[in-house]
Amino acid sequence: MTKRQNRMVLVALLVIGVSLAGYLGLKAFNENLLYFLSPTDVTKGRAPKDKDFRLGGMIVKDSIKHDGIKVVFDVTDYSNTFRVNYSGILPDLFKEGQGVITTGSLVDGVFMATEVLAKHDENYMPPEVADALEKAKNKQ
């Protein structure tokens, strides 16, 4: 092959390699993407099926029920409330009336959390949930 043909083959292989790397990177990103939803979003059916997502809001007063290491509590955005089941150790800041972000999936209409993060100040809550909480609070 001539030098020109060698360069063309090299450029073609380089373009194919970069395209393949970009495709695999985007695919991995989309597979690991966690959607963040409020209880209203979940109630309206916006939760992904058979995929983990984050549910955020405020812990409803008098809703926390402990059974050993298992915990059941309700999360609200002041418009809708959603039941959460969690098995594990809760963060120190977890308490009624506090903000919470849970990661998990829906199983038969109940959110089964695999991770619970307690909100410690206003900067911790993602803007989407803070906006949803503010809108719901203003409607009351």
Swiss-Prot record:
It comes from the Bacteria. Keywords: Cell inner membrane, Cell membrane, Cytochrome c-type biogenesis, Heme, Iron, Membrane, Metal-binding, Signal-anchor, Transmembrane, Transmembrane helix. It holds the Pfam family CcmE. Its main location: membrane. One of its GO terms (molecular function) is heme binding. The keyword Lyase does not apply. Signal peptide: none annotated. The chain crosses the membrane at residues 8-28. Heme binds at H120, Y124. It is found in: Cell inner membrane. Residues 29-140 are periplasmic. GO terms for cellular component: plasma membrane. It is a single-pass type II membrane protein. GO terms for biological process: cytochrome complex assembly. Residues 1-7 are cytoplasmic. The keyword Glycoprotein does not apply. Heme chaperone required for the biogenesis of c-type cytochromes. Transiently binds heme delivered by CcmC and transfers the heme to apo-cytochromes in a process facilitated by CcmF and CcmH. HAMAP family: CcmE. PANTHER family: CYTOCHROME C-TYPE BIOGENESIS PROTEIN CCME HOMOLOG, MITOCHONDRIAL (PTHR34128:SF2). Belongs to the CcmE/CycJ family. This is Cytochrome c-type biogenesis protein CcmE. It comes from Vesicomyosocius okutanii subsp. Calyptogena okutanii (strain HA). The lineage of its organism: Bacteria, Pseudomonadati, Pseudomonadota, Gammaproteobacteria, Candidatus Pseudothioglobaceae. The gene is ccmE.
